[in-house]
Curated annotation (Swiss-Prot):
It is an enzyme of class 3 (hydrolase). This is Protein N-terminal glutamine amidohydrolase. The lineage of its organism: Eukaryota, Metazoa, Chordata, Craniata, Vertebrata. The keyword Nucleus applies. It comes from Bos taurus (Bovine). The keyword Lipid metabolism does not apply. Keywords: Cytoplasm, Hydrolase, Nucleus. One of its GO terms (molecular function) is protein-N-terminal asparagine amidohydrolase activity.
């Protein structure tokens, strides 16, 4: 990371979202939190929706380390089965990550987030390496559906309290979350990247 460029960019950047504590948030429903954030951006014409993407992070084993998460204070990572963040590629050339579960700034300059939360694949066993499904926000709003059944145990009890608003569904589906979590490029919407590919595609710096 070179100098204070991300800090300088952040200083001139107007967030696309309300403050973190004013965002729609339900613990362990990151896919819906980001859907609601996309909806907010669509309804408040501050930035073109086409500058924004939902980013699903997972892998074949559904075991991905992410650092700087509120669920794990200190220096260690959380091992999620999947996680979802919002990526804003601003017309000013700087990208920002919106992660409602991080202890990093909200929003956070892309390069800062990658360095602190993802670190490097070189230091991670291959089975834990992250992949990224990047979906345009308009496509995510149009196509995502979840009946929240993945958050119920075998007895039908909620593992975590569900959001108070109705389930998100489309005319075609009530539940397609697994198509977004899947890192099979032949499935679902958007494009799938490795971490180096993701950084190369969206970083403002030459890694």
């Amino acid at each position: 990371m070179e100098g204070d460029a991300p800090v300088a960019a952040a200083a001139h950047y107007q967030p696309a979202s309300p403050p973190r504590d004013a965002c729609v948030y339900n613990s362990c429903y990151c896919e819906e939190n980001i859907w609601k954030l996309c909806e907010y951006i669509k309804n408040h014409d501050q930035y073109p929706l086409e500058e924004c993407y939902a980013v699903f992070i997972s892998n074949e084993r559904k075991m991905i380390p992410i650092w700087k998460q509120q669920a794990r204070p200190g220096d260690g990572p959380v091992i999620w089965d999947y996680h979802v963040v919002l990526l804003h590629v601003s017309s000013g050339g700087q990208s920002f990550i919106y992660d409602l579960d991080t202890v990093l700034p909200f929003p956070c300059p892309f390069d800062t987030y990658v360095e602190d939360a993802f670190k490097s694949d070189e230091d991670i066993h291959p089975q834990f390496r992250r992949k990224f499904r990047v979906i345009r926000a308009d496509s995510y709003l149009k196509n995502f559906a979840s009946d929240r059944s993945h958050m119920k145990d075998s007895s039908g009890n909620w593992r975590e309290p569900p959001p108070s608003y109705p389930c998100i569904e489309t005319g075609d589906s009530k539940m397609n979350l697994n198509d977004f979590i899947s890192m099979d490029p032949e499935v679902g919407w958007g494009a799938v990247y490795s971490l180096p590919e993701f950084v190369h595609r969206f970083s403002s710096q030459n890694y």
